Amino acid sequence: MKYCKLQDLCTDIIDCPHSTPEWKNSGIRVVRNFNLKNGNLDFTDGYFVDEETYLNRIKRAVPEAYDIIISREAPMGVVAIIPENLKCCLGQRLVLLKVDKNKVNPVYLLYVLMSDFVQTQFRRADATGSIVSNLCIPDLKNIIIPVIEENQDDVSKLLASINDKVLLNYKINDNLAA
């Protein structure tokens, strides 16, 4: 195993636009903090923008399949991976990781970002003293990531399979509670 800074495993780390777009009833999805759940995107509560707003919000980077989104605050350090065939842009307080697939499997990185090892680093990086926790980009870039050099794909598949079972259990519990 080796240890790398997050910035060394990404081709880019992009902060989202710091503005609230004008919402539409339909159109292109906007990922917001509350859409990030257990490494996945949950669009139970959906927000949309029109094409013009979308094009404005993706000027820094276009979110693509297997990019990872991290919340910078409220709550801080929650992550999700972008699935295939999702056209979206980011809302406020989010960061887009363009994962270098030649260096790390994006699914492996997603689960490492969810680990206690990394989440503890996120909490330690928040030294603002503010009531609202905040993860700033320079601190995020320097987060240390443990990288196994062999079997990343196998580990990623196993963790994704376990996560799928957990999500299924949540759905079953929701149906039983209804």
Locate each region found by the language model.
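Short glycine-enriched loops at secondary-structure junctions
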Residues: 36, 74-76, 127-128
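Short, positively charged
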Residues: 107-139
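Short glycine-enriched, charge-decorated loop/helix-capping segments at active-site entrances
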Residues: 46-49
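Non-catalytic DNA-recognition/assembly elements of restriction-modification systems
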Residues: 1-15, 142-178
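A short beta-sheet element
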Residues: 32, 51-114, 136
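Low-complexity, Lys/Gly-biased intrinsically disordered segments
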Residues: 1-41, 53-58
